[in-house]
Amino acid sequence: MAASLQQEFCALRDTYIEKQFGRLNDMQRQAVFTTDGPLLILAGAGSGKTTVLVNRIANLIRFGSAHGSDWTPREVTEEDVKDLKTAIMTGTDAPARLDGMLRQNAVRSWNVMAITFTNKAAGEPKERLRNMLGGEEGDEVFASTFHSACVRILRRWAESIGYPRSFTIYDTDDSQRVMKAVYKELSIDDKFFPIKSAINQMSRWKDQLVSPEEALRTPARDTKGAIAAKVYAAYEKKLREAGAFDFDDLIYQTVQLLAEHEDVREFYQNKYRYLLVDEYQDTSVAQFRLVSLLTGPEKNICVVGDDDQSIYRFRGATIENILNFERIFPGTKTIRLEQNYRSTSNILNAANCVIQHNTERKGKTLWTRNDEGDKVQVYTAENEQDEAMHIADVIGEHLKEGGHLADHAVLYRMNAQSAPIESYFTRAGIPHKIVGGQRFNDRKEVKDIHSYMSIVANARDDVRLRRIINEPARKIGNTTVDVIADLAAQQGISMLEVISHADAYAKLSRAIMPLLKFWQIYEKLQESLETRTLDEFAQDVIEVTGYKAMLEADAAKGHEDAADRLQNLGQLVNNVKNYCDQHGEDASLEGYLEDIALISDIDSYNESADQVVLMTIHSAKGLEFPYVFLIGMEEGVFPSEMSKYSEADLEEERRLAYVGITRAKKELYISNSVSRMLYGRTQRNEPSRFLREIEPEYIEETRSPALERRSSMGWGSSYSDTVPGGASGYSGASGWGRNSSSFGGRTGGSYLNREYNASERGGFGSGYAGRGSSASGFSSGSSAPRTSGSSGFGVGYGRPAAPKAASKPVSFPGSPAASRPASTGPKHYEVGDIVEHKVFGRGKVLAVKAAAGDQIVEINFEKVGVKKTMANFAPLTKITEE
C-alpha cells in the first residue's frame, strides 16, 4: 500500500511540477528539468532561451531535482495524494505542508550564478524571477555580466593580487593615455608601431591569458612584436602603480586570482553550486577559463548558446568553446531548442538556407508554428542614396498602415554604411537613433567630471589626474605636470601626494599657488563625499572645480555648445541620483564609477523611443524588430573583402548574416547596390553570395526604377566596365532564375545569382553576358529581348508583377519620395506659418534657417511636438499665415 502511494504521489508530483512550467515546449521543459551535471543547450535564434534560463533557475530553487524522482523525504499519506490531486485539478498551489515533499536537493537563490554579456541580458532574468519567485528570492540570484561578476570578485579579493579594493577601471581613452606615457618613457615612435596596435596586441594576450612575463620570454617574430612585449610590461606596471585595471584586466586578473588562490576558488565553488552561462558561443579563452574555475567538482554547469551565432571572433571569442564543450565536460547532456517564436517561416527558411553552407557547426534547423508570412524582399539599388530612399518609402507605407517608427531597424555590416542613411533621414526629418554613436559618458565634460570623481575614489589614479588638473585652466602646464610625475616616480608615491606638499619641492616653486589651490579643491571634494549624498557630491564636483562657471562664461560669450554641455552635466547629476535610487543603502562612489565603466553601447538603447533604429548587426545581437532592413549585401561589403581569404572568417561572416536575418519578426528587407561609396571611394560590387544561398521560393526581388529604365532600353548597368564579355554587360535580369537555361549552356539565374568563375563555367553566370555569348541584352536561351518585368534569363523565376513594397513613391514623415518627380521649385516658409504634414498633421512654424538653397524649418506639430525638417524635402502644405 505504502509503495503504491509513493509511486502515485511521485507521478502526481511530476504532473504538478510540469503544470508550473506548462507554457514551455517539450525541449524547453527537458532543459529545465535537467538539473545535475554539465548541460549544453543549443538555442536557436528566437527559441526562448531566456525563458529557459529563468525557468531552469526557478525550478532549481522551488523543486530542485524532484521531477522524475521516486524519492520523498517522508512516507506518503493518502491525505498527501488527495491534496496534491486537488491542487492539480483546481490549478491552485499545493498546501504549504507539502512544500518539503515537492522538493529534492533544491538550492537557495544565492547558490545560483547566471552570467551573460550585456547588462540588459543580465537584468531581464532577475526581473522575471522576481515575478515568479517573489522579490526576495528573485533578488538573491546573482545574474551578472562577465565583467560585472569579475569586478564583484575583485572588489573583495584585489589585495590578494596586490591591488587596492578601491581600484579604478580604465576605459579606452584612459588606456591610450597610459600607453602614450609608456611610449614617451621608452622612446618608441608611434608612427613605426601605432599605440592602437600595441593596445590591440595587449588585449589579445590578455584574452589568451598570456602574462607580460610570458610575452617577454616568447621569441618575437619581428621588431614590432618585441616592442609590444616591452610596452605590455611597462603598461601593466603603470596600471598597478595607479591601482587600476583596464577592461581586459577584469577577466584576466580574476582568472589569475582564482587560479593562484585555492581558498578564493573554493569559496566561490561552494557558494555558487549551479552556474549558468548565456551566449556561450561568444566566450574567449579567458572567459572559458573563468567559467571552468568557477565550476565546482559536481560540474553543475549549464551553458546556453548557438554556434550559428558566434560573431565576436574579432574580440577574442572562440567558437571552439561551444563546439568542444561535450569533450571538455564528459557526461554532458545536449538539448537543442529549434522552435522559433519570433519570425515567420519564410524568414527562418531564408536564414536556414544561408547558415547550412557553414561546416563548423553542431547542426540544427529552426522551425516555427508562426505564419508563413511575406517573402523576403530583395531590392537592388542604383547607389546608396537610392537604397536610403527605398528604405524611407517602405517605412512610410508601414506608417500609413498604423505602424510605428520604432518597429523598424536598419542593420549594416560596418559603421561607415550608416552615413548615407543617417544623412537622408536627417534631411527628410525622419526620427532616428544610431546605436553605437558617441555615448553620453564619452562626452568631454562628462568624462572630466567623472575623472574628478575618480581621483577622489582612488588617489593613485594619476591618469585621470593628468586629464583634469588644468581643466578648467589653472596655469598648471604640461611641464609642471611632468615634473610632478617625475617626483612621484622617484619617491614611489602618487602625483596627488606630491601636489599636497607642492611647497616642499623647489622644482615646483613657480606653480606652488595653483597647485595648492588644486589641493584645496580636492580636500573640499573629499569632505563633500563624506558629508553629503552622492548626487549632491556630484553637483559639488561640477561647482567647486569651477567647471560650471567655465561653461556659463562660454555660454555668455556665445559659444554654441556651452548650453548643451551644461545640460549634459545636469543629466550627469540625474544619472547619479537614479543610481542612488536603484541601489539604496548600497550606493557608493566606487559602485557608480564601476557602473558607468561597464555600460555597453546597447545598454543605452531606449526601446520605448519612437525612432527608427540604425545599428551594426553586432550591436543588434539579442534584439528583435517587426521590420528589419539588412543593407549592403554585396561582395566586399558583406562578406567583407578581408574575409574572402579565410574560410574561418567567411564562416563568421555567414553567421553574422544569419544573425541579421533572424532579427526580423514580420518582414525582412535585404538590399544590395550596384554602386556604393565607402571611405571616399566608389566601388562596384557583385551581390553577396549570401543572397544567392537563399532559395528563390523564399524571396521577391525588385530593382531601382533607374535600373529598370536602363534595362527596358537595353542599356548596360554601371557594372558594364567590370564585366568580361561585352560592353553592355548586365542588362537588367530581375528574377531568381536559378533553373533557367542561361549563358554557355549552363544553368543560370538572376542578376543576383550569377556565378563567380566565368572562365570555368563558359559564362559569367546570370546577369552578365558571358564569354562567347551575346552582350546585346538578349538571353542565350531566347531570341526575345529582355524588358522590364521580364522573367530574367531564360525561363527562370520572374520578379513579381506588382512588387509588395515601395511600388510607388510614398509619403513619409519628411520622406523625399515626393521629390523624385520633377521639382515644382523651392518652398519658402516663415515663422508663424500654419502647415499640414501628410503624416505628422498640422503644425506651426517656430523658426526658419537658410541652408544651401533650402530652409531648415522647425515646426511644432499638434500631434507629435517639435520637429525639424528640410523645406524642399518634407511633404508639407502651407495652410495659412498668422
Role assignments for model-derived ranges:
Residues M1-P164, I169, E266, E320, ...:
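P-loop NTPase Walker
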Residues T50-L53, G68, T77, I88-R103, ...:
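Helicase P-loop NTPase motor core
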Residues F33, G37, Q104-S109, Q256-L275, ...:
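Short basic/glycine-enriched coil/helix segment immediately N-terminal to the Walker B
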Residues R23, D70, D80, A87-A96, ...:
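Conserved helicase/translocase P-loop NTPase motor core
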Residues S47, Q281-E360, K364-R369, D486-A489, ...:
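Conserved helicase motor core of SF1/SF2 NTP-dependent helicases
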Residues M633-G865, F873-E882:
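C-terminal accessory regions
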Residues R217-R221, H404, S418-I430, R443, ...:
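Conserved helicase C-terminal RecA-like lobe
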Residues T35, F117, E137-V141, A158-D249, ...:
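ATP-hydrolysis module of ASCE/P-loop NTPase motor domains
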